[in-house]
């Protein structure tokens, strides 16, 4: 029997059996678009609302502050672009590192092509940045 070692947990992880069990009805029976107006979607719309409320309780915030995305890439892209465009008048500098996930690096490149000044800091062998480099990047 061959044993496998999976080392890319940054990309995806094992799904806990309880999560699979909870989600199974939405993959097999109730798969309607929760944003649509037809009744087939009511169960899904209710499930998403309740999920948002549960997460908000855990995080002690409003359900209106909870957003679900389909992936880490989508979340990275959305967060970085959202902050960049919302704060564009305050400054167009974005500081990150050269070892970020490609979703971050590609979004940085996208924003640079649209006039943002994206600074990529080096890291040491442990993945740490130099605070002096950060300070310089912040004051340029």
Role assignments for model-derived ranges:
Residues 1-140:
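Pyridoxal 5′-phosphate
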């Amino acid at each position: 029997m061959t044993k496998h070692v999976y080392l890319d947990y940054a990309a995806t992880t094992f799904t806990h059996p309880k999560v699979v069990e909870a989600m199974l009805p939405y993959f097999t029976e109730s798969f309607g678009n929760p944003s649509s107006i037809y009744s087939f979607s009511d169960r899904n719309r209710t499930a998403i609302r309740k999920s948002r409320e549960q997460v908000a309780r855990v995080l002690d915030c409003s359900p209106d502050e909870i957003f679900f995305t389909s992936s880490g890439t989508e979340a990275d892209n959305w967060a970085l672009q959202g902050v960049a465009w919302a704060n564009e008048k305050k400054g167009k500098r974005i500081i990150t590192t050269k070892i970020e996930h490609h979703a971050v690096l590609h979004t940085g490149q996208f924003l640079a092509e649209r006039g943002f000044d994206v600074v990529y800091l080096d890291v040491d062998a442990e993945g740490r940045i130099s605070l002096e480099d950060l300070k310089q990047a912040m004051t340029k």
